[in-house]
């Protein structure tokens, strides 16, 4: 499908999303979410290999949710793609993804994250914790976000590099050449609420005395 010169392709992702946008005039390509892992294996991998064979790259990947039907396909891609400097599938310039650690950082930006919270975050690296997202009314797993963050770091990908404070948030306008992207969501309020809820669950499952205000 093409709208105003922009190519839009929605790959099969069942209940999730996997959306490809190409802006020919700006020579810019963006992937929004990756659906399930099977979305990657059945559809996305072949699609990206074709792009790479044409000499194209992904300028930006945007991960909007940490639910399986949005994030798992991206995890599968990064796991197979490997090192960003020598990718096995396709070159990726940058990834936008707010990890839970960044949500906590947004809440503590002014007061600073306490040493106790930092220690607990490190200690929880191998633990699965589910909590109810106030806005989505469904359980989402910290493990999804943690694993993606690890893959981004291990592959040396540019992570939220073009946004202020490395946090994708409402109101920012990001320029890629002559292409301008205005970020509509999430707002800082949403991010800080998620961070506060995460800290609450850390407090419930740890013996450490953490005061949450």
Indicate residue ranges for each PLM-predicted region.
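Structural recognition of the beta-strand scaffold that forms the well-ordered cores
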Residues: 22, 29-32, 59-63, 94-98, ...
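Active-site environment of divalent metal-dependent phosphoester hydrolases
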Residues: 15-17, 37-38, 66-72, 102-104
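A short acidic (Asp/Glu
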Residues: 20-21, 70-76, 106-109
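Active-site metal-binding motif and surrounding structural segment of the metallo-beta-lactamase
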Residues: 42-95
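Conserved beta-strand hairpin/beta-sheet module of binuclear metal-dependent hydrolase folds
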Residues: 2-57
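Active-site-proximal beta-strand/loop segments in catalytic clefts of secreted hydrolases
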Residues: 34-35, 64-66, 100, 186
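Flexible, acidic/histidine-containing loops and adjacent segments that form or flank the divalent-metal
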Residues: 1-6, 81-213
């Amino acid at each position: 499908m093409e709208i105003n010169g922009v190519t839009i392709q929605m790959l099969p992702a069942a209940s999730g999303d996997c959306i490809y946008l190409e802006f020919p005039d700006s020579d810019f390509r963006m992937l929004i979410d990756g659906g399930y892992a099977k979305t990657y294996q059945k559809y996305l991998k072949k699609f990206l290999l074709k792009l790479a064979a044409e000499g194209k790259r992904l300028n930006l990947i945007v991960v909007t949710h940490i639910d399986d039907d949005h994030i798992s396909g991206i995890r599968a891609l990064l796991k197979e793609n490997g090192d960003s400097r020598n990718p096995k599938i396709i070159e990726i310039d940058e990834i936008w993804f707010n990890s839970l650690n960044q949500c906590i950082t947004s809440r503590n930006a002014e007061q600073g994250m306490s040493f106790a919270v930092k220690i607990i975050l490190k200690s929880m690296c191998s633990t699965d914790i589910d909590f109810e997202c106030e806005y989505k009314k469904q359980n989402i797993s910290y493990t999804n976000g943690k694993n993606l963050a690890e893959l981004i770091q291990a592959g040396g990908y540019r992570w939220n590099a073009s946004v202020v404070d490395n946090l994708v948030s409402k109101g920012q306008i990001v320029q890629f050449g002559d292409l301008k992207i205005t970020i509509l969501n999430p707002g800082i309020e949403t991010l800080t609420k998620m961070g506060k809820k995460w800290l609450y669950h850390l407090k419930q499952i740890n013996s450490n005395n953490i005061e949450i205000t």
